Each structure stands twice: as structure tokens, then as C-alpha cells.
Amino acid sequence: YHVSQFGFDSRVVSAVGNDELGDEIMSVFKEKKLNTQIERVDYPTGTVQVTLDAEGVPCYEIKEGVAWDNIPFTDELKRLALNTRAVCFGSLAQRNEASRATINRFLDTMPEIDGQLKIFDINLRQDFYTKEVLRDSFQRCNVLKINDEELVTISRMFGYPGIDLQDKCWILLAKYNLKMLILTCGINGSYVFTPGVVSFQETPKVPVADTVGAGDSF
């Protein structure tokens, strides 16, 4: 959405079911004039139940066995990959082998060109991730977006305990030869790491209405 607002050619890649929710989603994209690469498949359209705790932090109940778990790698998607300069993908969409295989084929099909961006925006939700999926994604991306809680989990899984957050970020940046690592820390601000350089931005104090999607918009 944000990329299209800047006038760039962008696509939303996913899958929806042959149901009313799928129709509604396609209608919203059409209304907002957003380009899509969304397949209609014989699985129900995905839904998420979101509840907020006392501090406004969202908790998610994500339904399984849904359309976006089964995104096919079509000839049209292959053509898109061959002409893509930047892509953003996450870990949640890889919880099912079908969509994981499609995401990996898309990334591997993209031509290696200067300035190319493969952005991995980790979304550690429930138990929908494995060390193998995360390692493969680290190896395929060149930009990593992560929050402080996810960084602690990743450090525990990969054996980086007992060091501060910045040290963990430098380790990931070097180990996977990343162009950039973006760390968000909620009310404690955010960091951007590039080889040899780190910048910090404080979080502005604003009334919190709903934090759902705040990390994605960042």
C-alpha cells in the first residue's frame, strides 16, 4: 500500500478462498486501486482473532488450514519474480510447506541485480515457526526487520544469550551478510544497523488507540 502511494508498481501476493470473505478482500483491493497477485484456491479465506491486553498490545489467534497457507507458484508469479527489484516476506506465511515453497521459489527466481532488496519481516506468532525456516529466510534476505521480543527468541534459538540487544544485532548483520537490520523496541525507540553504523530514533509519545499493524507500517 505505502509503496503504491509513492507511485511505484507494486503487488500484493497471497491467496483467498472461493467464499464471501475472499470476495470482500478482492473488492477492497479493487476499491483502493491496489494491484494484486492473489489466487483463488479451494481453502477458506484466512481470519485472525485479535484481542488487546490492558496496555493495548495485540494477541492473535490465527486460523490454520486457510487459503494463504496454500499459495501456488504459478507461471504468472514466476514472471513477476523475474521483474521484481524489492520484496518483503515474513515467517508466518511459511508455516505451511506449500506457501513456504512458493516464497522460496519466488526469492530464488529473482535476478541478482544491484540495489535489490529482499526484506525479511519476522512475525513470530504462536508456534508457527521453526529454526530451519528462520535460518533459510536469514540466508535468503539482505534486510532484516525484527522487534526486541523476537530478537530475544531468535538469540535463544541460535545461541546468542547473555549479550545486549545491539551486540545480538551486530552478530546477525555480520553472520548473514545483511545490508541492513531494523530493530524496533516499542516505547524504547528503534534502531537501524548497517555495516559499521547504527542510528537510533526515540518513540514519540502519542495516545495509543490500536497497535495492530504498527510494525508493518514502520
Give the label of every model feature segment.
Residues 76-77, 134, 169, 208:
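Acidic, amphipathic alpha-helical patches
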Residues 86, 90-167, 171:
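Conserved beta-alpha-beta core of the PfkB/ribokinase-like small-molecule kinase fold
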Residues 79-80, 136-137, 174:
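Structural alpha-helical scaffold elements that stabilize or flank donor/cofactor-binding regions
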Residues 158, 162-218:
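Conserved phosphate-binding/catalytic region of the ribokinase-like
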Residues 4-5:
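Gly/Ala-rich phosphate-binding loop of Rossmann-like dinucleotide-binding domains
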Residues 8-91, 108, 112-114:
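Conserved N-terminal subdomain of the carbohydrate kinase-like
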